[in-house]
Amino acid sequence: MENRAMYLTTTHEDRENSSFYEESYDGMNLSKLNLCEEVNSTKYRRKTDNRCGQLDSLTSIKYAIVSLYILVLLTIFGLCIAVSKSHASWRREEALLENVTRLGEQSETLQMSLSQIPSQSDLLENIWKLESLFHNHTEQLRLLGLLTQGLERDIKDLQAFAEHTTDSVAQLWDHLSMISHSSQRNSTHLGDELASTAGSIREQDALLKTMVGNVETLQERLEDMGWTLQTLNHSLGGDVSLHQIKIYELQEKIVNVTHDTLGMKITQTHLEDQLRNEIQVLNVVTADLRLKEWEHSMALKNLTIFQGPPGPKGEKGDVGPLGPDGIPGWIGPRGLTGEKGVQGPRGLAGRNGQDGHNGDKGEVGPEGPKGVRGERGPKGEKGERGDKQGEKVEDAVVRLVNGSGPHEGRVEVLHDLRWGTVCDDVWDIKDGDVVCRMLGFRGAKEIHKTGRFGQGTGLIWMDDVACVGTEDSIDLCKFSGWGKTNCGHVEDAGVTCNV
């Protein structure tokens, strides 16, 4: 080891004992490092003196170690700053930390090896180790530089991506803000619409309740109208049957009158013929008598005077008055039946015919549904105390309403402290007699049906009244019961009493 010629390379501008570490550091030329070498203007030459001062060599080694430590610290500091500013991938960070750790371990190994230099004999060997170590460190630093450049590029890309991400986040935040404001406006608008809808629903609910009440009322009215129509149909059915019977009787009477009229017409024709013949005979007799009278008068006048010749014809006289119509001629044969003519206008209504006989009493109809109980009226004032022994008042009281006088009108009966009418089913003159006698009249002159004196209001107390005619009160007559009826007020009965 001592015979190996190793020299440090220096330029001719440097001092002879200056260290090679004072040159600019070139990592690519470390492998060509020569120790204790002098340079001439023309060529290199080795020193013949194989001794390089031990003190200068140790100083140079110490300077190299210090420079290496400073370089390593600066590299580590730069890497820490680069790593602190970025969020590179964990694999590259691990590789970088591994390289730094390895570099630190090699530096510690170098320090330990330098501290354990035993003597001048081992100096050249240590220098060779240092040269190889520098070479290894140079390669590692070059790789570290490449990794640092890649890391910087990744940091730039990461920064650009971070800026793009920041812009995207800002745009997303603006979009979210717009969506939030729009959602708030939509929520407010939706709340207003829901409030208005709730109000409309409440109004519709109130209207539906009102309509339900109206429908129930209308249904009740329709039921009442149905009962009224049934009653009216029942009554009209009886009246129609009576009218049909009367019409049939009238048709028979008309046929009989037609036959009688034809017979009388034939008789009249014969009488007219006889009168015409007798008038002709009478005219002939009258002419003969006039001629006889003229002859007698002329005979009396011509007793002494002879008749001269006739004078000239006189002027034509005036037309005399028309004589009476002649006697109609004989009836000619009946001609062919002509075509049916156009129907003429409806004639005036004829007089009401006489009331027909009462028909048989019909069957009692089904009992109607019970009506709704009315509200209780206010309590009346307390009346005066009556006599202890008073006359018994009859339960039924009768009155005549809406007539031309107290002797006629619609019959109303007082029952249960309420006035009500009487239905005209089977209403006849006997019933009217009882009512008129109750009112102090001698009897009934005429009875009336179908609301002749107007339609009453309230209840219809009595129906199917059948009096014998000798009762003192109408409530003693037979009837269907108080308030039991299938009639309407169009069938209210009336009466006209004898005054």
UniProtKB/Swiss-Prot annotation:
Entry annotated with the keyword Transmembrane helix: yes
Record's compositionally biased regions (Basic and acidic residues): 357-392
Cross-referenced Gene3D superfamilies: SRCR-like domain (3.10.250.10)
Glycosylation, residue list: N99, N136, N186, N233, N256, N302, N402
Disulfide-bond pairs as recorded: C423-C487, C436-C497, C467-C477
UniProt-listed GO biological process terms: endocytosis; intracellular iron ion homeostasis; iron ion transmembrane transport; protein homotrimerization
A Pfam family matched in the record: SRCR
Region entry Disordered, spans: 305-392
Signal peptide: none
Cell compartment(s), UniProt: Cell membrane
Domain Collagen-like: 307-359
Extracellular side: 85-499
Residue ranges constituting the SRCR domain according to the UniProt record: 398-498
Annotated keywords: Cell membrane, Disulfide bond, Glycoprotein, Ion transport, Iron, Iron transport, Membrane, Receptor, Signal-anchor, Transmembrane, Transmembrane helix, Transport
Membrane association type: Single-pass type II membrane protein
Record HAMAP family: SCARA5
Subunit-structure text: Homotrimer.
Name of the protein this chain belongs to: Scavenger receptor class A member 5
Gene from which the chain derives: scara5
